[in-house]
Amino acid sequence: MELENFVANNLLLKARLGFNKQTGRSKKWRELLKFPPVSMCTELRWSIEKDFSSLCDKQPIGRLLFRQFCDTKPDLKRCIEFLDAVAEYEVTIEEEQREFGLAIFSRFFKEKSEVPLPEIPPDIVKECKWNLKQNSPSQNVFEECAGIVCKYLSETPFEEYQESTYFNRFLQWKWLERRPVTKNTFRQYRVLGKGGFGEVCACQVRATGKMYACKKLEKKRIKKRKGEAMALNEKRILEKLHSRFVVSLAYTYETKDALCLVLTIMNGGDLKYHIYNLGDPGFEEPRAVFYAAELCCGLEDLQRKRIVYRDLKPENILLDDHGHIRISDLGLAMEVPEGEMVRGRVGTVGYMAPEIINHEKYTFSPDWWGLGCLIYEMIAGHSPFRKYKEKVNREELERRVKNETEEYSERFSEDAKSICSMLLIKDPSKRLGCQRDGVSAVKQHPIFKDINFSRLEANMLDPPFIPDPQAIYCRNILDIGQFSVVKGVNLDTNDEIFYAEFATGSVTIPWQNEMIESGCFKDLNENEDDLSSLEKYKMCSSILRPKRNFFRRLFRRTGCLNIALSEEREPTEH
């Protein structure tokens, strides 16, 4: 029995190591990722939405190919260099920001330049210079300048890009992205745990060697529990979210017996394991604060899409290989319509907010309560209303949540006590995060004084703990109970409509990131002869003008600079 677990663990570790060394790819990986002739992409060329933000910013491969196109033209290359510099300025530490900003201004706005930027009104340049000379210039000093550069790129350069071989190559990648996904796309490894409708196991994409977690939803179990709406809701929410602080959905497919969600694999285990199984219960405060800061970013991303999570607890917060956390298991999450409130008594006993227990309406307040519970538990080593290993029935626990005030030990600093007490206020209208300032008020709490959120969101801060790469942070295979066989349920043709809606294949942004991270994009694109051969397929027909011509981030505080930033945080349509 122990031998079975040992073998399964070794196979998984070998597969994980294979991706890091790019040896996990199938020997036939080039055949699996063979580009079609551009002539096969004609329909795709005309059906794809000609949106500059989507094609050249949000989609990672599109972003890289557009940059490669710009590198062939000095004026466009200059624009990209400016956007890169501004993106770097935005994540520069405050002490160095002014000096770095002045260096950018000197480099790109001096009067005599062989390759000047697109014309920017003198009053905007003057205001930019004045702001930079202040002691603490803001992060968005270059916002208007960057917006003008982005608008310039979205017009004639974008049209020229669509007539180039680089866009032809992009269409070939899109063709590969849209191919059907089946169980044969992956290698399957050991079971990692159990979900509500089936097992979760590790899997590996044959073509790239990329490791994922495959969450299997047994078809008969879904039908017996009438879980179709819940399963589809989780899939749709994951599909529209692209946050480094929430697990990503990369693929959906079906087998004869199951619907499968292929998700970010988190090899570092969950917070519950780390709180209670490695030394004394609880963390040192700096570690708890780091995780709390990343959770704030994750909740902000969810709320930006008007999603309330409703199940924050240590088991649902997972660590990746590098020690960063992500929110997982969005089965209870739901979208809150603009201007409305929702009601629903869902969650886990001991972590549910008072307004949920009382059947009251809410928007995002339960998640700020959940964050308070998590911060408290990470520091104290037990949840706010139940001692470690204390046996308490549901009714008593709910009574404590509604009526009692949590107690604080000497492990809590004044700042830690302050944020927990502000997040655990019974009245949601007075709770931290629930007023007009929302997440900004939480981020500005003194406990986060040493956290640079811009750098955190750009993945530029080192975690306080890095999981052991040789460890398997999950239970032994034999300790993970098996599901019983579902009897008395028959699948019919009516179920096929639901299955077709669920199993839609690759998700654009994660799939393209996989191609880049695995090195497949670089390896296949380095063949310049192959790229130049695309010229003979070049289409001479006029290209439709884009319906929108601004970067998405032009409408945000940080400006439209995502072309130079790392992981995209918004979805794009297939």
UniProtKB/Swiss-Prot annotation:
RGS domain span: 51-171
N-terminal as annotated region, ranges: 1-153
MF (Gene Ontology): ATP binding; G protein-coupled receptor kinase activity
Activity regulation (record text): Inhibited by heparin.
Binding site for ATP: 192-200, 215
GO cellular component: cell cortex; cytosol; plasma membrane
Enzyme Commission number(s): 2.7.11.16
Enzyme class: transferase
PROSITE patterns cross-referenced by the UniProt entry: AGC_KINASE_CTER (PS51285), PROTEIN_KINASE_ATP (PS00107), PROTEIN_KINASE_DOM (PS50011), PROTEIN_KINASE_ST (PS00108), RGS (PS50132)
Record-annotated active site: 311
Pfam families linked to this entry: Pkinase, RGS
Domain AGC-kinase C-terminal: residue ranges: 449-514
Post-translational modifications: Palmitoylated.
Record GO biological process: receptor internalization; signal transduction
Compartment annotation: Cytoplasm; Cytoplasm, Cell cortex
Domain of life: Eukaryota
Catalytic activity: [G-protein-coupled receptor] + ATP = [G-protein-coupled receptor]-phosphate + ADP + H(+)
Modified residues (N-acetylmethionine): 1
Database matches in Gene3D superfamilies: Phosphorylase Kinase, domain 1 (3.30.200.20), Regulator of G-protein Signalling 4, domain 2 (1.10.167.10), Transferase(Phosphotransferase) domain 1 (1.10.510.10)
Chief location of this protein within or outside the cell: cytoplasm
Domain Protein kinase residue range list: 186-448
PTM-bearing positions, type Phosphoserine: 484
Family: Belongs to the protein kinase superfamily. AGC Ser/Thr protein kinase family. GPRK subfamily.
Biological role: Specifically phosphorylates the activated forms of G protein-coupled receptors.
Assembly notes: Interacts with DRD3.
Protein name: G protein-coupled receptor kinase 4
Provenance organism: Mus musculus
